Amino acid sequence: MDNLIKDMRENLNSYSFKVVSDLVKELDVNRDNKAQIKELADLLKEDKRKNVSSLGNRLEKNLNNLIKEEERVKNMYLFDKSFGDYKYVAGVDEVGRGPLAGPIVSAAVILDSSDLDDIILYINDSKKLSEHKREELSEIIKEKALSYSISMCDSKEIDEKGIGYCNNHVFIKACEGLSIKPDLVLSDGYLIKNFNGENKHVIKGDTKSACIACASIIAKVYRDNIMKEYHKKYPQYDFEKNVGYGTKTHVDALKEVGPTEIHRMSFLKNIL
């Protein structure tokens, strides 16, 4: 990067717009090269050619977006630290409460909040992220988390015990499955009933808390992958796309073919 800046300082006027544009497109704006990106953006903005100058403005915008993202995520980590002097704070969230088929899945995650220069960028409510971004982040989270755990209840358990019970049960099991005992558990939406530990609930926690957002992401990816496997066995229900939710294609297939072993019969009373 330093060599590129040196080269640009010496030869920018001799480079065509296309050459400069191609070089800029190849740049990865990240936390490790912010100073160099700022220097290069300023250099391009000073160029008398409007199109080259606009590349500098674009690069500066990308840098500013990165800085804003760092600040947003840093605040999520600080939110987790704001509850007191707890060493290990876990976030727990679930996915799959509302679908007609498949399990309800919960994940619990403990992050390292001691180094705010090593945060996981782009974490958010899993529903706000693209499938590709969720999958990418899920691997990063599992690699960087101090501990994580996943728990689920299948459709049979949901029919036998109810979705409310199963929702609470997977929260407890995910927390109990952590290799590190959390000093505090932040749960998305509501308190965990009959949980043997310190617990606080956070409304819309997956947009406020770093550890809840991470739990949301790995739970979503885990469940989506289960439903993709079920799609291979039951392709007519389109589980690959609807992941068990009641889309028109899914409901039409239910009416035409009937339910499968993974359908929640207690959810189908108004459909069949």
From Swiss-Prot:
Enzyme class, first EC level, given as a word: hydrolase
InterPro entries named among the record's database cross-references: RNase_HII, RNase_HII/HIII, RNase_HII/HIII_dom, RNaseH-like_sf, RNaseH_sf
Domain RNase H type-2: 87-272
CDD domains found in the cross-reference section: RNase_HII_bacteria_HII_like
Keyword Chaperone: no
Domain of life: Bacteria
E.C. number(s) listed in UniProt: 3.1.26.4
Catalyzed reaction equations: Endonucleolytic cleavage to 5'-phosphomonoester
Gene Ontology CC annotation, any one: ribonuclease H2 complex
Note accompanying the cofactor annotation: Manganese or magnesium. Binds 1 divalent metal ion per monomer in the absence of substrate. May bind a second metal ion after substrate binding.
Claim: Metal-binding is one of the keywords in the record: yes
GO biological process: DNA replication, removal of RNA primer; mismatch repair
Pfam family, one: RNase_HII
Names of required cofactors: Mn(2+); Mg(2+)
Subcellular location: Cytoplasm
Alphabetical UniProt keywords: Cytoplasm, Endonuclease, Hydrolase, Manganese, Metal-binding, Nuclease
Binding-site list for a divalent metal cation: 93-94, 188
Molecular-function GO terms, alphabetical: manganese ion binding; RNA binding; RNA-DNA hybrid ribonuclease activity
Cited NCBIfam families: PRK00015.1-1, PRK00015.1-3
Biological function: Endonuclease that specifically degrades the RNA of RNA-DNA hybrids.
Family note: Belongs to the RNase HII family.
Protein's UniProt name: Ribonuclease HII
Source species of the chain: Clostridium perfringens (strain ATCC 13124 / DSM 756 / JCM 1290 / NCIMB 6125 / NCTC 8237 / Type A)
Lineage start: Bacteria, Bacillati, Bacillota, Clostridia, Eubacteriales
